[in-house]
Amino acid sequence: PEGTYHITRGLSLSAPVQIQGQLVMPDDAPLVLSKSYNLSTYIDAFKSEELAFKKAFQALLNSGDHDSLDLSGRSIAVSEPIDMQAAVANRTEYAQRRVIRNGQFYAQGDTAWENEVVNSVATYSQNTPKVLKNVVDIANIPVGALVEGHGVGREIYVKSKNVAAQEVTLSEGLFDADGTQNFNFTRFKYLLDFSGFEKLSKFSLQNIEFQCNSKASGIMLARTGYVFHIKDCFITRPKYRGLTSIGTACQGMLVDRCHFMTAEPNTKSQDRISIAINANGNDVKLRENWASQFRHFAILSGSNNIVSGNHFYQGDGVANGIRLAGLA
């Protein structure tokens, strides 16, 4: 019958189910619907698209019955960044192949998507090329923040931090930055944020639109891992970033037949702030993608990459305007 039902621990149902009423469960309690595993069933159960997606994803990583989550063609209104690891709090690593497919994520609201910005002082040495030491106010510096400062190259991110030791580990080393200086740390907000995972491998996103609405960025990868695969997806109007790697979870990453649509079509090329893709690892493959009018299409730091059959352009409406690289 209709009503609200409180389930205090994990529940697995191995028969087909049709849910009436609403379920209330602790965040750490999985609901595994082995014979009715799709997003629509979870929405029926929890009456909230965001919560239903989190619980369905939790089940995906806590059950061997399915390798993929079908979003049932649903459009999920997202009011704040989805912390994918927090949805599966019992796991910080996962290496079995898993897929999310067939739906749309739609950013709504405003304040939840605002950047976190921290200004700090830290010391850098070439002897430890990916570490900042004696970092002031380190507790407030978020993992995944973009780092800016003297000697900091493009797309350098906070991969991890050690608050007790006052040390920040970076995605890449710096150049000519020895000594103590001021750094700016800016944390963008993403529709799907995997950065809470220490390691995530063989994970795939397929046939999904990420409707960022000039509010959110698209996807942030885990800290480490390999063969993240995104194919036949649309990342539409990301405010700052489309697909971000803060570590080496992009090792062997595959981006196939995806469409990156800018939020800045009428902005001069030199004034744009959005970047479609960055990667730090090796063996990245970008194939048959389309991207228009970002500051850069892709920033690739590794080696042995394949960039094939892509169509990207950076132009603006200014006669003899400044050109910026599509690939760097």
Regions found by a protein language model. Give the residues of each.
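Flexible, charged surface loops at secondary-structure boundaries
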Residues: S12-L13, Q58-D65, E93-Y94, N140-P142, ...
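Short coil/turn segments at secondary-structure boundaries
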Residues: P81-M84, A112-V118, A291, F312
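Extended amphipathic secondary-structure runs
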Residues: P1, N62-M84, K189-F234
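Right-handed parallel beta-helix
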Residues: Q20-Q22, S68-G73, Q96-A107, S201-C212, ...
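Small/polar beta-strand repeat architecture
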Residues: A15-V17, M25-L51, T111-T128, V136-V143, ...
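Extracellular beta-strand/beta-solenoid scaffold signature
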Residues: S34-L60, P81-A89, N127-K130, F183-G196, ...
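Core solenoid repeat modules with strong leucine/isoleucine-rich periodicity
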Residues: N140-L146, I156, L170-L174, L243, ...
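N-terminal extracellular ligand-recognition/capping segment immediately after the signal peptide
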Residues: P1-L61, D67, S72-R91, Q104-F105, ...
